């Protein structure tokens, strides 16, 4: 009887929503990584607490769910800076001033990249379901509300995430990141979505560090999908070009 009482709330929750939190999270990953590949011009606007802005542009390439290259074009002091993410959480960064490619060590992957509010891990992350367990903690007319907790053995700087998922598209509308003490740290919002070749793809994303009162807005322009990108793009040698 005690065992039945323990599992009854979980059974009722599953019947209430008709889908589990982990199933929703898998759908989120599937939608976010649906195109075979994509290339785009990325505009990054960095805004400090006084409202001052810095604008950076970069070429961005992605193939599948585990290959990504970002190469900065401007401003001049950032031109050529590149970030490469490969399978199995392998990441590299290239700074032209040093003329060398460096592998991103595990102890710095949660540091912010090139003055943005995104960490190396954020840039190299291709999904949530691999590292997080999800439970549905609420819903509204348009969204499921999930609480994501890191799976045992994963190395994450967050105690948990709170995610609002669109019921129709299964795109995350907003994700709140909470630090180890349970305080709100960062908020990611998808602020615009386009349908390209049948894929619902975010074209404007903001990431706000509420502690530093700093925000990064990413806008993706001239996006092309399923173009047959070569694997040669996702190499250390290509970073140096």
Outline where the language-model segments fall:
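Gly/Pro-enriched, hydrophobic low-complexity segments
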Residues: 100, 104, 124, 141-236
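Acidic/charged, solvent-exposed loop-and-adjacent secondary-structure segments enriched in E/D, K/R, S/T
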Residues: 95-122
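Short, conserved active-site entrance elements at the starts or edges of catalytic domains
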Residues: 113-149
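A short, amphipathic edge element
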Residues: 23, 52, 123-135, 182-187
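Sec-dependent signal peptide recognition
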Residues: 2-10
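Short, structured patches in soluble enzyme cores that scaffold and shape functional sites
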Residues: 72-74, 95, 138, 148-150, ...
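N-terminal mature ectodomain segment of secretory-pathway/periplasmic proteins
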Residues: 19-96
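Hydrophobic h-region of N-terminal signal peptides that target proteins for export
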Residues: 10-18
